[in-house]
Amino acid sequence: MSREQRPNPRLNEDLLFNEAPGGPPRYSPMTAGPVHYLTIADREGEVIGYAWANDEDDAAGWEVRKAGGDEAFNKGARWARKLHDAKARGVAPTAALAEMIQESDLTKSSHVVPGSLAEAPNLGYVEGLANQE
């Protein structure tokens, strides 16, 4: 009689995952069209990232500035949350940027750089800004 251990047959079964519908509403994370964007900085004035939006594709997102490291990533969560909250309230993407400008507070850990609202030809341009050293 062999004492060889056999693997549990359940370990060889395929797992079935059924995608559940629903979840919170989200703006599309991509667009091929032009985007409006805001520059976001920390208290010291160091750029931590960019919030962008395009109404035609119902798209918006947050691009963290890679050179900002973990600190920029952590501070950027606040701005990504603002976009998620705006979408949940049915706010158009560029209107969400306008809210960010209105609610920005220079005394917080990060803020919209005054006068930074700009337009870019595409999302790739903003991603390029975020990837600069």
Language-model-detected regions and their locations in the chain:
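Short, hydrophobic/aromatic-rich segments at coil-to-beta transitions
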Residues: A32-T39
